[in-house]
Amino acid sequence: PTQQNPIHISCSCLMDASKTPIFWMLTITFFICGLSSTGIVGQHFIPFCSDNNVGAVVAASYLALMGIFNFLGTLGSGWLSDRFNNYNLLAIYYGLRGLSLIWLPYSDFDVFSLTLWAIFFGLDFIATVPPTVRLAGNFFGPIKGPIVFGWIFASHQFGSAVAAFAAGETRDSVLTYLPAFVVAGASCFIAVMLIIPFRKHKPVTA
């Protein structure tokens, strides 16, 4: 395989993976991951805070705090992914993320609530990546797994783009970010429902 055209290898892996339910589950949930993280929070958290009388510099500080706990959360998620059921972890991560996104618009946007949110959401921000990578490796093998994850990651970026655009359009139309954040949070619960049927799914490739 190393002597083949890399584009052919990549497309061949995609064709094979697209015939499996696990690929579509991971692809759709990772689309939701991008939508509910970098797409809406990465692009719209600061202007959302500005709409609630929180200065841009202060809001950016909360975003930086979120980044610190994102680092810790990702490390912790990697450790957990080596030891526990990755489906359960993903379901928990998406569920908690959904709750935090829905809670934010109804918070007071004061120091306590924004600090609490930044820590909580930060721990969950990239936590979905380690179990997603591990599941891709488990099901598609050490050679195809990374390539398949590359395609799955493309859906993450597409989800980010959709949320970045749609949340901005919604804000301009209804003059509030509340619907966008609630919809993003609700989408996380869709991810949970997609994951649950796979909890006892076994790898089909070595």
PLM regions: where:
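C-terminal ends and interior cores of transmembrane alpha-helices
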Residues: L96-F109
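Interfacial helix-cap and linker-helix signal at transmembrane-aqueous boundaries
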Residues: C49-S50, L80-S81, A166-L175
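Extracytoplasmic gate region of multi-pass secondary transporters
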Residues: M15-S77, A163
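Loop-to-transmembrane helix entry/capping segments in MFS-fold secondary transporters
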Residues: A56-V57, P142-I152
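Cytoplasmic membrane-interface "Motif A"-like loop-to-helix N-cap segments
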Residues: R83-Y94
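Hydrophobic core of transmembrane alpha-helices in multi-pass small-molecule transporters
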Residues: F31-I32, S113-A127
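Intracellular juxtamembrane helix-capping segments at the cytosolic ends
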Residues: A127-F140
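Multi-pass alpha-helical transporter architecture, strongest
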Residues: A184-A206
